[in-house]
Amino acid sequence: MYEANEKRLRFSLNGEERERDFIFFEVRYNHFRDVSESVAHEVRDRYEGRVCECALALPDTYRETGAKTPLVLSFHGAGNTVCAERHAVGGVKYATSLIDSGFAVLDVCGSEPHGLTMGCPEHLFAAFKAYRYAVRHYNLSEQVLVTGASMGGHVAMNFANNFPAIVLSLGLIYPRLNIDGVTVGDHYCIGTWDKTTAKEGKISTHDRIVEIYRFPENEWCEARTVGFNPYRSRSFIGADGKRVVIPPCPVKIWQGLEDKTVDPVMVREFAESIRRAGCYVELHLLDGVGHTITPVMREELAMWFERFV
């Protein structure tokens, strides 16, 4: 196990006057994924070590002994990352209300230096290693609360689905929920797979999906997304032809009705699919709000998570 290069930095976030302390550290995880269908009688698994940078913020109420501080995993979206050199703390940046409410908050760069890993298996493996490091080296709760905005919401949902034993609750802020397109009534909700336009010299989201999910011949391959496509994970089609999604824990979602990046129709359908399963979900739709985190979202997220500590 690789755990090294821990450093502590102090700087301000979000234009705040106050400075905060951040702990940066690195974990090593296995990047290998067996995506072939070979029948050869041989050991196929192997170790491909990669290093992932992580950021942890502790609240003023944190103590090294006594009651454990509740831990939140706050995953960043596709436009952010974690990098000590750049004072980039990923999803921790948007969780200051949680830190001020007594929660520790953790995020990871992702499975590649660019951080745009979009909830693929390696991203979750790296996040789990970071979680284990945090709870082993600090007085933090082993059961966690998980949040994320936009693509970070996609990562958060995937993490909860794959590690249900340690997740108490999900708080999703305008989450990306479908890799492939979904038709709801007469409305088509585009997936990340559909976003083929490249921006600012970068490859398109479509091409990023091909890369990180390792699609063969650059063609759609549903088998490579199983377990990592939130709307289709832990789900089935009911007798009425509607999808039923069974989340591993209670869920609350915040979604702006003027969002042009995440389709509010898709988010509503996701909430309804959870209700069809008889599971608990809350959905707060915000009129006049686009693809941005508002003070209302921050305050309610803290109140939502306080129910579970």
What kind of region is each of these model predictions?
Residues E3-G66:
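N-terminal cap/lid segment of alpha/beta-hydrolase-fold proteins
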Residues Y138-S150:
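Alpha/beta-hydrolase fold nucleophile elbow
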Residues K260-M266:
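Conserved alpha/beta-hydrolase "acid-adjacent" motif
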Residues N158-W220:
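Hydrolase active-site cap/lid region
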Residues L283-I293:
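Histidine-bearing beta->alpha loop at or near hydrolase active sites
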Residues M118-Y138:
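Alpha/beta-hydrolase active-site loop
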Residues P247, I253-Q255, D259:
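Short beta-strand/loop motif that positions the catalytic acidic residue
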Residues T65-G66, G77-T117:
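Short substrate-entry loop that stabilizes the transition state in hydrolases
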